[in-house]
């Protein structure tokens, strides 16, 4: 029978360095006998303090004095000398602080889950009521988002290597032993699983374990794995009514300073799937919004409902309804225009602003914006989008074709006739009826976009393009203003529409602008180069938001 369940230990597998390794190092540093600390922690004393701890019969704070006393008695019995300031609590605090998530192993678990495996964490863990309990809480919070089940010994009253916990795992996952692969860093924990018929992998080092896991599951893990994305079913969804009959849908994760992620055309909150967990883990409250007209947000048909002035006002209302005085606004594509305007017209509500691909382009009050669009060949598709109903019919006819044609890397974006749409009578003219899915998306992800656009249609999203004159007149009111809030511009080398050179004069209007640049990247920056995007954003956010300079910028 084929494997369909993957069970992972926490310490030493999903979290490194292992506590056992730290205890071993401490034994050596204090010149203690081998296994003096490790033996106690590994429950070599049945019904002793550690077994009670792992079964949830006592808490960490109850366990510490018992272990301190046990260690002092053991030291006298074996003639070992403990330092006066010896503290099990301090040793464990240092061990917990040193641990971090083993990203390659987490990526492997995510890849298996994406392939259809049920994934589970099976760990001997404790009820942590210490003053450092937030360390364990943060790790478990992040990991639990990526697994179907979390089985902790302290919650179920059973520990590895007792056989009953493995039976509990099988019952919980509704699996047979020969359908399960189990990974642990202790052979003693694997033996009962192997005796029951599970496939077992002893994790001595991550690389070897992953090679073995690839072999037994028939799954090839990427050499340069992507950040772990969130899925629609694993995030919290919310709604804010910004005016009668109009609501905005958003996805939320994390705590800390608020970040509003704003997507472009034709996208969804889901386009930020690789950024949401990473930014939340970095210490931020992330709100990824379905922009007006998209997905589960309202999509009124009137063109004027999508005027930039109104869209910005509704973003302010969005913040008000959630009780958020200020937020970091990060936008891509059309939402890049929105976030720059938020910084110009509502700077008091903008803690910082960043745009992917879309530069700040102040209007020329002497030249009609439609003339500008007509003068730039690659903007021809925007002229095609102007007539209500025309582009809607083309894009809604076969949405699988639409999204597979749009979401492609810079190397094969030629499927779209962006510079000849009016001449050819469409933006999809000449594209295959059933294009192959690009390497930056999957069939399942394309299906989610289709599902979302079946709710909203393309009328609302296309209406963002149909307020050009109205937006121009409004934006002229900001002529002469400068953006003084912390700001970041991220350019993508191979974006054929929003080219990096279009941003070259931005420092004239944003004197303290920071920059990031991503090579070999096209228009769909967040999903084409998610690791690079995350690195740039988090570095900037930590500098500007979490550790800001005290120097005034005025």
From Swiss-Prot:
Pfam families: Abhydrolase_1, Hydrolase
Example GO biological process: stilbene catabolic process
Region of interest (Phosphatase), residue spans: 1-224
Effect of substituting residue 433 to Q/K: Slight loss of epoxide hydrolase activity
Active site: 333, 465, 523
Modified residues (N6-acetyllysine): 176, 191, 215
Subcellular location: Cytoplasm; Peroxisome
Cofactors required: Mg(2+)
InterPro entries associated with the record: AB_hydrolase_1, AB_hydrolase_fold, Epox_hydrolase-like, HAD-like_sf, HAD-SF_hydro_IA, HAD-SF_ppase_IA/epoxid_hydro_N, HAD_sf, PGP-like_dom2
EC number assigned by the record: 3.3.2.10, 3.1.3.76
Span list, region Epoxide hydrolase: 233-554
Recorded consequence of changing residue 542 to T: Reduces epoxide hydrolase activity by 80%
Induction: By compounds that cause peroxisome proliferation such as clofibrate, tiadenol and fenofibrate.
Catalytic activity annotation: an epoxide + H2O = an ethanediol; (9S,10S)-10-hydroxy-9-(phosphooxy)octadecanoate + H2O = (9S,10S)-9,10-dihydroxyoctadecanoate + phosphate; 8-hydroxy-(11S,12S)-epoxy-(5Z,9E,14Z)-eicosatrienoate + H2O = (8,11R,12S)-trihydroxy-(5Z,9E,14Z)-eicosatrienoate; 10-hydroxy-(11S,12S)-epoxy- (5Z,8Z,14Z)-eicosatrienoate + H2O = (10,11S,12R)-trihydroxy-(5Z,8Z,14Z)-eicosatrienoate
Domain named AB hydrolase-1: residues: 257-530
One GO cellular component, as annotated: peroxisome
Keywords on record: Acetylation, Aromatic hydrocarbons catabolism, Cytoplasm, Detoxification, Hydrolase, Lipid metabolism, Lipoprotein, Magnesium, Metal-binding, Multifunctional enzyme, Peroxisome, Phosphoprotein
Ligand binding (phosphate): 123-124
Annotated effect of mutating residue 495 to H: Loss of epoxide hydrolase activity
Modification Phosphoserine, positions: 368
Family label: Belongs to the AB hydrolase superfamily. Epoxide hydrolase family.
The protein's role, per its UniProt record: Bifunctional enzyme. The C-terminal domain has epoxide hydrolase activity and acts on epoxides (alkene oxides, oxiranes) and arene oxides. Plays a role in xenobiotic metabolism by degrading potentially toxic epoxides. Also determines steady-state levels of physiological mediators. The N-terminal domain has lipid phosphatase activity, with the highest activity towards threo-9,10-phosphonooxy-hydroxy-octadecanoic acid, followed by erythro-9,10-phosphonooxy-hydroxy-octadecanoic acid, 12-phosphonooxy-octadec-9Z-enoic acid and 12-phosphonooxy-octadec-9E-enoic acid.
Domain notes: The N-terminal domain has phosphatase activity. The C-terminal domain has epoxide hydrolase activity.
UniProt cross-references to NCBIfam families, sorted A to Z: HAD-1A3-hyp, HAD-SF-IA-v3
Protein name: Bifunctional epoxide hydrolase 2
Lineage, uppermost ranks: Eukaryota, Metazoa, Chordata, Craniata, Vertebrata
């Amino acid at each position: 029978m084929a494997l369909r369940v993957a069970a992972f230990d926490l310490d030493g597998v999903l979290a490194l360095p292992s506590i056992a390794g730290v205890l071993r190092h401490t034994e050596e540093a204090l010149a203690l006998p081998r296994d003096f600390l490790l033996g106690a922690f590994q429950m070599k004393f049945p019904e002793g303090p550690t077994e009670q701890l792992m079964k949830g019969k006592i808490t960490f704070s109850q366990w510490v004095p018992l272990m301190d006393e046990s260690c002092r008695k053991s030291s006298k019995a074996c003639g070992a000398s403990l330092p006066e300031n010896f503290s099990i609590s301090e040793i464990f605090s240092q061990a917990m602080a040193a641990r971090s998530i083993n990203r390659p192993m987490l990526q492997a678990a995510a890849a298996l889950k994406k392939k259809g495996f049920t994934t589970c964490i099976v760990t001997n863990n404790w009820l942590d009521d210490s003053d450092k309990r937030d360390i364990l809480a943060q790790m478990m919070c992040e990991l639990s988002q990526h697994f179907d089940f979390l089985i902790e010994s302290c919650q179920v009253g059973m520990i590895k290597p007792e056989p009953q916990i493995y039976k509990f795992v099988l019952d919980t996952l509704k699996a047979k032993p020969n359908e399960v692969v189990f990974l642990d860093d202790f052979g003693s924990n694997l033996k009962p699983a192997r005796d029951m018929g599970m496939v077992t992998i002893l994790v001595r080092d991550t690389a070897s374990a992953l090679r073995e896991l690839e072999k037994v599951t028939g799954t090839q893990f990427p050499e340069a794995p992507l950040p772990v994305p969130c899925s629609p079913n694993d995030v919290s969804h919310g709604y804010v009514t910004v005016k009668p009959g109009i609501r905005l849908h958003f996805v939320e994760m994390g705590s800390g300073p608020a970040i509003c992620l704003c997507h472009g055309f034709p996208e969804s909150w889901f386009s930020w799937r690789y950024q949401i967990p990473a930014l939340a883990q970095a210490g931020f409250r992330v709100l990824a919004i379905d922009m007006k007209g998209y997905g589960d947000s309202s999509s009124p048909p009137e063109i004027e409902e999508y005027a930039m002035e109104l869209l910005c006002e509704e973003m302010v209302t969005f913040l008000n309804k959630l009780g958020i005085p200020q937020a970091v606004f990060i936008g891509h594509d059309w939402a890049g225009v929105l976030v720059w305007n938020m910084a110009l017209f509502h700077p008091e509500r903008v803690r910082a602003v960043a745009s992917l691909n879309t530069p700040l382009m102040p209007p020329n009050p002497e030249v009609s914006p439609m003339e500008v669009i007509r003068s730039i060949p690659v903007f021809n598709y925007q002229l095609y989008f102007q007539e209500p109903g025309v582009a809607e019919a083309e894009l809604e006819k076969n949405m699988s074709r639409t999204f597979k044609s749009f979401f492609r890397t810079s190397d094969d974006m030629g499927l779209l006739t962006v510079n000849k749409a009016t001449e050819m009578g469409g933006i999809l003219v000449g594209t295959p009826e059933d294009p192959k899915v690009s390497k930056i998306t999957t069939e399942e992800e394309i299906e989610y976009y289709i599902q979302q656009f079946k709710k909203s249609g393309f009328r609302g999203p296309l209406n963002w393009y149909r307020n050009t004159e109205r937006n121009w007149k409004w934006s002229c009111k900001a002529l002469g203003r400068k953006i003084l809030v912390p700001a970041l511009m991220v350019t993508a080398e191979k974006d054929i529409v929003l080219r990096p050179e279009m941003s070259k004069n931005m420092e004239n209007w944003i004197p303290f602008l920071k920059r990031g640049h991503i090579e070999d990247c096209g228009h769909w920056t967040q999903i084409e180069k998610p690791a690079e995007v995350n690195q740039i954003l988090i570095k900037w956010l930590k500098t500007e938001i979490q550790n800001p300079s005290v120097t005034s910028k005025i």
